[in-house]
Amino acid sequence: MADGEHTLPADEELFEQPPLQQQQPEIAEPIVMAQEPIQGVSEDPQASEATHEAPDNYPVDHQMENQEFYQEPQIPEPQQIPQIPVFQPAAYNPPNYVAPQQRANNFGEPAAAADSRPLTEEEQLAAERPTEDTVWIDSDDDTDVEEAILRANFWLPYSDHNYDPPDPADRIILPTEGPFPCIAGLDEDCNIVKQWMPEDAVGPGSPGTQYRRNQQTGGGLPSTSVAPQQQQLPVRHNIQNRPMVAAQPFSIGGNQVEYGGIGGMDSRMQQRGVVRDGPQYRVMNDFGNGLPMRGQLPPRNSPAANAINRVREQQQQMYHQAGARGSLQQRVPAPAAPTPGSYQHIVNAVPVGGANPMRRVPPQARPGMIGGAANNNRARPIHVTRPMDTQEFEHPVAPAAAAPPRRVVDVAPHRMTPEQRQELQQMNRQRAAPQFPAAAAQRSAEKIVIQQRPGASSSRAPRPSMAQEDLLRSPTRRLSERVPQEHQTPVLEPRRFQVKVTDTYSTPIPKASDQLPAQLTEEDPPEESAAAAAPEDVPDAAPEDPPKGILKPTPPHRMTQEEKNAHFARLTTDKEKPTSSASILPQDAAPPHVPPPPPPPLVLRPHHQDETLAMVQSVFESKPRQPDTPKDKEAISKIADLLRFSADEFTGQSGSSAAARQRTVSGSAARAQTYQMHHQQQQQHHHQMPMDQRKRHSSGRYDALMGAMPLQQQPPPPPPSQFQHTDSIAHRPRGRPKGTRHPSVAVQPQRSGGARTLPPRAQTVAMSARNGANAKNSDSESEGIDEAAEESWTMRCHCGMDHGDGDTIECEGCKTWQHMACMGLTLKSNTSKYKCEMCLPRRLPVSKAEAAREQERILNRLRAAAKKQKRKSEPVEQKQKSQPSTSRKSAPMALQQQPAEPRVAQLNDYSKQASALLFGMEQTAGADTLLAESRLHKKARRMFVEEAVEALVTTDLVQIRQVILEVNGHVSMSNEVKRQPGGGNCIFMYDGLMKGTAGEDMGDGQELVCIDTKRKGNDTKFTRRSCVPNCVLKHVLGSNATLGIMIVATKDITRNTEVTLPFDADWRESEVELECAEHMKELQACPFESERRRFAAERHRAMDHKKREAEEARRADEERRRLEEEVRRERAAKTKQMDEAEKARLEAEKAAEKEKKAKEREEAKERKKMEVEASAAAAPESSNSITAREERRIQQAEEMFRRQEEEGKRKEARRRSKSVTPGVLEAAGTAAREDAPEASIPAPAPSPPASRRSVSRTTQPSTSSFATPTEPPAKNKRMRSVVPPKSEPASSAKRVRATTVATPKDTTASNDSRKRKSSATGKTPVAKRSKNVVPTSFGLALIEKELREQARDSTVLEMILPDYIMKEKRSGLLAGQSPDFSEVRAQIEEENRMKERFTKREAKKKAVEKAKEKEKKEHRKEPKKANEPGPAPKSEKAVEKAVEKVEKKPKSPQKPPAKPTAQKPPLKKTEEVDGIEREASESSSKESSVAPEEKKNPKKITFAEYNSRRSQKREAGECSTPPAVTRRGFIPSTEGEDLVNVELSAIPLDDHPSSSNTAPTTTIAPSVGGAPKPTSVVVKSPSTRSRTRGAASESVDDAPAEHSMSLQDRVFSMFGSTVDAPAPPPPPPASAETNSRRSRSTRWN
């Protein structure tokens, strides 16, 4: 716990005792008195002997100085109180400590002489003599022969090596455990028994002890006290000089509650705890050594106890009852008459003279002193549960009885063999009636059991049997033989008990003999143990004396299966032991043939004795031990369940009231009643067989013995209906409202087949949401029904039904119940925080109609199950009537109902978490009685202590540790309620549930209970807090999990005194001022308030620091996010750029790949075309005709070829150089007829395309126009070829279809003018077929061959038929023709030749493109001069160059500089016609670069152009007229289209339709910059052919520079400065409009 934290003081400081004041017989106010000083031991060896005789010496070993659990004594002088640097409230004295002393001349040793002489024998014996209050803790040697004896006699393999240390001297108590609290009055099973002490038997540390000793010895000896050394030690576990008490008058952490003198208890029952009416004992050193007495030095290892207080005469008892039987002193019997039933305890655990342990004979056990006058010993009576009706005598050499017959193996009855069943019956007949323990405290015996041992001085003397000596508890002693008679004072030996560590169990076991296996209890009569089996001869038993006490039992989790079986057998035999006078006699006085008498009626011990193990466990809480493994815990749980049910059965059949003994760990009254009903029904159903008259334990095993009570004496079972109803209440399904009856199960659980059903260890059932009551705690059926009737619950379900059958669940919000099936829940669903659809609106998986139908099915199923159960129960009644013990006409007897235990009213409300916590805790013994008394006798009420201030004020004198009032209200956990820290607002926080018996922390910090007294409470809500409280809160746990939190006084409180409580544990966390009752006017004077303010200031500073840190963290986080966002954006931008670059690269690669693939496709197409041409040329002619179907397919192919041709033309035009223009097609169309004679070619006349198609091939008249048929040809007829006549030019056809033949009929033209080889001579096939009638049908191969011939002879475009036509299934005649291998070779050669030609052509194209690129680069590098006209088109550059060469004129400054023209490779004469495009490109490029004097190669032109060209050549003379440059307004020649937006009136050089003058015109160019007038040159207008060629040479994609030049500049740039031409007319007024119109771009720009 942190420094400065306020905690409640220890119990001995809370409940401080007032001093002994003889002058004040009545105590009105608590008087503080310092305790007696505890003297240390002098280090001086010459110290006086009187110093060591001081009764208050506190010998301390120096090894215990730094032990964790060492408790230091207090310093009595107030002036020596050290200042502890911790926070302490007002009026609170910190504990004082005495420094541990060195072990020099300690334990009351006599003063040594100067020569350090050794002690004499008398002095040694005097030093070893124990005091009258010496307490020994039994501890055995691991190698003792006692284990073998007990194993041979009782089949109980004991072992104590798990707990005992190797050194016997340390077995009293380990140094690590701290001072051991001597709990007076423990029996062998560690149960607290009622005790009484003689009036002069007080502890050596109590007041008046030294005076009495001085009187007995004849005078007092002077004593010298030594000032003790002071040493400040830290507080150990907040246990500061805690008095070692046996029990406390009420519960602290689960201990029992007990009243003195309550009716039903023994009249001699002494109050336990720190009381003023009886002695209490405390060990004085770490090893349990005793104090010196009469100047004798006790042995080093002898324990001693010091009385905390003395018995005060004429003092009022704390809990005085009217029914008490007088005071303690009146109940003490005469000293000379020892009380029967008491034990003589072991005095010495280790012998003085040697290593062999020897028992010393007490003075009253010596020969000749039994019953003599010298026997004045007084024994402390310890009441046992074993009856003692006669005097017992045991002789050490008594003969041993024969071993009892072994019982048969615990086998299920239906699995027993006939021999086993017969043997079991025989054993049941031979055994005596079962004997149960009786309360010996309520009847007296004549004499005490004393064992005589005449030869005790010899170490080899015959030793008594272990059963006789250990059960008698009267060891022999030799010490009193050597002590003078005058020193033999009444010796009250501390009893010898066996310490059992039960910390492995979570709850105490009510019956000590059933909770731990294999241990001898006080209920075991010695003669039964002696007669059970004769002691076997043990080899090592004779030479040594037996050790002290019996061995410690083996822990349950370490027992083997054989040990468990032996323990179960012993549990049964414990209940068979006789208690009559004849059976208690020694074995020689009770013959075996005498039948034992029936057992007497029994009176059980009080309830408080059942909780004894909890106190013993709390003593050893601080003992370090190894944690249990999961396997050990599982074994412990199983064995604990078995033993708990055995304890229930044992106590239930012992003759006591079932309602009073059903408060056990293993089950509640309802559960025990259920078991008894079922058990009695089984007995009634099966008692016709003798072997079936056995008791079946709840633990699942069968008891082979008959029941303790005859079957006729057992109460009849209740009716089956009541049994079923009680079972349904106790075991209702999860979520069912309490009180609703579950329908009967269809089939009862079968328990045949030998199956052993083990109920769960902690069987929890559903708890009520209102008052937290559990059905299992109800004592009867009527009680459960009453509770159900009192409980109010509301069923509001989705289905609309309000019945409570089936599985239901409660809403935590509105506290209403719903059917789980209607809510869509199952038993496996998580319903920890369930809320209905009203509190938590949501869509339910089940609709209302489905929910109603489901509930109807559930109700029908439950009704059917109830009817089925009713039918099944009928044969049971018939079987019961057929029993021989009952008449057929007689009806079965009604089952009697067990009497109900009075219920305790529920004055508190409990939350669910609080109810779950309380149901897991054990009930406190006597809690109901204490709660009833506190509610009946209220010692305080609310009053006005100031104006408008109410408080709780006492109305009577309240003594220390008395209950003032019970706090009532709503009990909940600390996390379920909003409260003010420190206390207030009528809410009390209680942390006692986390405290153990000694006040140490037992919980995990989450078991803080809060009681809200605002809504439901009593006058305790007005209790105020104070820094000097006079009360505290304590709790008890009553029946039905009733938590009673009471206000208990920590000091004597007078009448009309305000009751105050300490602040809650979290008072430092309060943000408001504490309301201290002592400092209401000056809160600053309250130390708690000052401390709270300091903590609040620190807390505020810490909060401010946290806020600053949080703000800094937030800002840093924002900055970090901002930087991250910037980095993210930068990265995104870079990534986007990289993605775009990558995308562009991929697109470029894709485009390049696509272009490459397109080129490859074109090349493949070209190659395929050549292959088809070669194959068609080699294919033989066939006279077969085609069908109408083939004709239609040809027409479809023809249309597709036309579209493919157009698409190919468009693609080729985009890839061509700028020299290829749309005019090439026209030039190519007219170039085929240039070589025709001028006389045979008439003037060109346009004709529509339709007329050309409809001209007949066979009958063609010699007219100037094509013959046009009146109707188009039918689809099923052969397409007719249209052949133009001789007089009609073929240049008008822009596009020629595959079937259109544009060749002239006259084939007499010279062969020199035609560029073909194979068809240069002779007539063409078309001309031949035109003279004859073409048959209606012919073969497909013939058509293909004819088309290819026409393509070579005429201007018909070449095309390739698709593959599906070529590969189409042909007729039988064509299919039968076999291919010729010579044709295949020729085809291969042709393919190679075509590939070579294609390669050359591609190289030529690349060279032309390279020259063009070079020319463009040079043009960009040349700077543009002033007044220099724009660059002329490519076709004009050649004209300018030619003009310069012809006229030999000097350069003028106005003439643009000549630009170098790229040298093109010389053209080679082609052997064949490659195509129209190639011819056009070659002709245009050749004309632009050739000189005027060169003779041009003949071209395919029309006859009209041919004639005009010849006439122009004659007129020009030696030079040829250069081709005219394309000017603004000229449109490329297009067939069938009109000129748009053409204005030629202002252009005198052109052949305009408005001017018929063909004379030469002289044009004078203007002078530029004062240059001399050049000579005029007569230039004729260019011909139509020249304009056509100029227009054809203009690129569509290139906008000529002449468009932005004036007419004079264009003429000057074309013809130079010597051009003589008439001046142009003045411009019109709207010159701007004209210029704008001219500068407007057209669709050809």
Curated annotation (Swiss-Prot):
Residues 973-1064 form the SET domain. Keywords: Coiled coil, Metal-binding, Methyltransferase, Nucleus, S-adenosyl-L-methionine, Transferase, Zinc, Zinc-finger. Pfam families: PHD_5, SET. Disruption phenotype: Exhibits prolonged lifespan, increased resistance to heat stress, reduced brood size and changes in gene expression. In a glp-1(e2141) mutant background which lacks a germline, extended lifespan, increased H3 protein levels, decreased levels of trimethylated histone H3 'Lys-9' (H3K9me3) and 'Lys-27' (H3K27me3) and changes in gene expression. In spr-5 null mutants, accelerates the progressive sterility and accumulation of histone H3 'Lys-4' dimethylation (H3K4me2) over generations which is seen in spr-5 mutants. Its EC number is 2.1.1.355. One of its GO terms (biological process) is methylation. Residues 592-603 have a biased composition (Pro residues). Gene3D superfamilies: SET domain, Zinc/RING finger domain, C3HC4 (zinc finger). Residues 1103-1217 form a coiled coil. CDD domains: PHD_Bye1p_SIZ1_like (cd15570), SET_SETD5-like (cd10529). It catalyses: L-lysyl(9)-[histone H3] + 3 S-adenosyl-L-methionine = N(6),N(6),N(6)-trimethyl-L-lysyl(9)-[histone H3] + 3 S-adenosyl-L-homocysteine + 3 H(+). Residues 780-789 have a biased composition (Acidic residues). Residues 16-31, 67-82, 429-443, 453-467, 1173-1183 have a biased composition (Low complexity). Expressed both in the germline and in somatic tissues. The keyword Zinc applies. Residues 684-699, 731-741 have a biased composition (Basic residues). The keyword NAD does not apply. InterPro entries: SET_dom, SET_dom_sf, Zinc_finger_PHD-type_CS, Znf_FYVE_PHD, Znf_PHD, Znf_RING/FYVE/PHD. It is found in: Nucleus. The PHD-type domain binds histone H3 when trimethylated at 'Lys-4' (H3K4me3) in combination with a nearby acetylation (K9ac, K14ac and/or K18ac), but not H3K4me3 alone. Belongs to the class V-like SAM-binding methyltransferase superfamily. Histone methyltransferase that mediates trimethylation of 'Lys-9' of histone H3 in vitro. Involved in transcriptional regulation. Plays a role in the negative regulation of lifespan and in heat resistance. Together with set-9, negatively regulates lifespan in a germline-independent, partially daf-16-dependent fashion. Together with set-9, plays a role in germline development and maintenance and might play a role in the restriction of the trimethylation mark on histone H3 'Lys-4'(H3K4me3) to target genes specifically in the germline. This is Histone-lysine N-methyltransferase set-26. It comes from Caenorhabditis elegans.
